[in-house]
Amino acid sequence: MGTIADDILDDLHGRILKTLDQLRTELAAVRTGRASLHLLDNVRVDYYGTPTPLNQVATLSVPEARLIVVKPWEKSMIPPIEKAIRDGNLGLNPMSDKDLVRVPIPALTEERRKEIVKQVKHKGEEHKIAVRNVRREAKELIEVAEKDGDISGDDAEKALEKMQKETDDGVKKIDEIVAAKEKDVLQV
């Protein structure tokens, strides 16, 4: 196959992997009823007037299955950390305890678990669409290269077959990631 087709396929592969990584990152922040440091990934603390990621002003740990402990590097950061976690729309109620903040993770109701599963499936669908859009763009590039005479018809056909397999594998992997997260959310 021509190098143009190889370059297009390499780009497709890289963009699909990036989409899978993005899905994993987004789903890591979804609450499952068990403590996970990723729950607080999007929490920003007012650090001397600058919104700063929580993990840049404190040490985070999970000593128990339903508890996150936040140990700020400066004691003065305890109230802003509590406020940031409370305001983070995570349904969490942090409590200060001398020089640290305890964040108990409440159990999820069955109804809430089902809502979360819907969100997880929706995120999976969004990422499947992204993978298909990447395939469509790559297909258009292959067709243009064939029309311009940069690659032969046979090479274009082989590239399109590889592209479809790559896309199918990406969609299958998204289904696996979503199924694993669903199982995690529904587990009591």
Swiss-Prot record:
Question: Transferase: present as a keyword of the record?
Answer: no
Q: Provide the primary localization.
A: cytoplasm
Give the GO biological process terms: cytoplasmic translational termination
Recite the UniProt keywords alphabetically.
Answer: Cytoplasm, Protein biosynthesis
UniProt cross-references to CDD domains, sorted A to Z = RRF
Which InterPro entries does the record cross-reference, listed alphabetically? Ribosome_recyc_fac, Ribosome_recyc_fac_dom, RRF_sf
One Pfam match, given by its short name, reads: RRF
Tell me the GO molecular function terms. ribosomal large subunit binding
Q: Where in the cell is it found?
A: Cytoplasm
Listed as disulfide-bonded, the cysteine pairs are none
> GO CC terms on record?
cytosol
PANTHER family per record: MITOCHONDRIAL RIBOSOME RECYCLING FACTOR PSEUDO 1, RIBOSOME RECYCLING FACTOR
Q: Which family does it belong to?
A: Belongs to the RRF family.
Instruction: State what this protein does.
Output: Responsible for the release of ribosomes from messenger RNA at the termination of protein biosynthesis. May increase the efficiency of translation by recycling ribosomes from one round of translation to another.
- Give the protein name, as stated in the record: Ribosome-recycling factor
Q: What organism is listed for this UniProt entry? A: Anaeromyxobacter dehalogenans (strain 2CP-1 / ATCC BAA-258)
Q: Which gene encodes it?
A: frr
